[in-house]
């Protein structure tokens, strides 16, 4: 895409953007929705580490504060940097063309500087818990910014798998803030659940937005290999979630039943996609189910510790 075409896209995006407040623009810059959803997984890791180490949350309120604020700043920072990196392709996609780095509400230099500052500030807050929490935060940030955004996103269909590594780190940040050894198997089950969950989640989104990804030149799996192969991959990864609750027996039978029912429901919906003619409608259903799945699953992990 030449410079003139890019300018036309930018101008079109700007003129079609609704009026927004400075706060709304800031929330879009740091991708507040992503930060909020990942905060749940950070808190779950923190809470379960307390539970399995026989510790009280009231005795660790300071660590809870530093963990939530620190991880939130790290995630917000890497999202800012992602907006900075993707500012050339975001105008080409419907769901990203109103980002403040596209519309001009925030200049690229500000997004870069602000992202780096709050990222470093996040590491400082995490350092007030344990060095291992900082290391986990760094691994997540490096994977998302360098390995995903700068390297694989625009080159390989495996970009989804690489990006899922960074998205699986937040519960380990929370756990490491309490137990830096990360020696309990449930800590790594949280990582595996988050890693595997993201792949069918984002592949479903890629099917829904396949034309946008194609227009932006991003080699998502459905763009390169089509819907049938993508649906098979979604099913393979969804089935991989099925045995994981049985390695989390420490959370009790109630959680194992809830998690297994959620997994079976997702698998059944997935198989339905091979009979359904409207692939886009099915991908939306899979995407919505995945969001509800994650929320119910992680809230259940917390709730069962009270009984």
Swiss-Prot record:
It is an enzyme of class 2 (transferase). Signal peptide: none annotated. GO terms for molecular function: protoheme IX farnesyltransferase activity. Keywords: Cell membrane, Heme biosynthesis, Membrane, Transferase, Transmembrane, Transmembrane helix. GO terms for biological process: heme O biosynthetic process. One of its GO terms (cellular component) is plasma membrane. Belongs to the UbiA prenyltransferase family. Protoheme IX farnesyltransferase subfamily. This is Protoheme IX farnesyltransferase. It comes from Bacillus cereus (strain ATCC 14579 / DSM 31 / CCUG 7414 / JCM 2152 / NBRC 15305 / NCIMB 9373 / NCTC 2599 / NRRL B-3711).
């Amino acid at each position: 895409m030449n410079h003139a075409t890019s300018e036309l896209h930018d101008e079109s995006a700007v003129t079609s953007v609704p009026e927004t407040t400075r706060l709304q623009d800031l929330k879009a810059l740091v991708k507040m929705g992503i930060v909020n959803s990942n905060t749940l997984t950070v808190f779950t890791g923190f809470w379960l580490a307390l539970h399995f180490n026989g510790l009280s949350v009231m005795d660790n309120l300071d660590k809870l504060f530093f963990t939530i604020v620190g991880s939130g700043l790290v995630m917000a920072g890497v999202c800012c940097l992602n907006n900075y990196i993707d500012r050339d392709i975001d105008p080409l996609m419907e769901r990203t063309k109103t980002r403040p780095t596209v519309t001009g509400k925030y200049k690229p230099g500000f997004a870069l500087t602000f992202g780096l500052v709050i990222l470093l500030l996040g590491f400082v807050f995490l350092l007030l818990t344990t060095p291992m929490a900082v290391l986990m935060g760094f691994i997540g940030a490096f994977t998302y910014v360098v390995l995903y955004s700068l390297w694989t996103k625009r080159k390989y269909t495996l970009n989804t798998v690489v990006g899922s590594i960074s998205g699986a780190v937040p519960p380990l940040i929370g756990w490491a803030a309490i137990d830096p050894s990360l020696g309990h198997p449930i800590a790594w089950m949280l990582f595996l659940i988050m890693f595997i969950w993201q792949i069918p989640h984002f592949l479903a989104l890629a099917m829904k937005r396949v034309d946008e990804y194609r227009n932006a030149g991003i080699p998502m799996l459905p763009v390169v290999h089509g819907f049938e192969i993508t649906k098979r991959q979604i099913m393979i990864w969804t089935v991989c979630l099925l045995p994981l609750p049985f390695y989390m027996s420490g959370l009790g039978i109630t959680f194992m039943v809830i998690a297994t029912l959620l997994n079976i429901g997702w698998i059944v919906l997935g198989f339905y996609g091979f009979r359904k003619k409207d692939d886009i409608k099915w991908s939306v259903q899979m995407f919505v189910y995945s969001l509800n799945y994650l929320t119910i699953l992680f809230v259940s992990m917390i709730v069962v510790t009270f009984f």
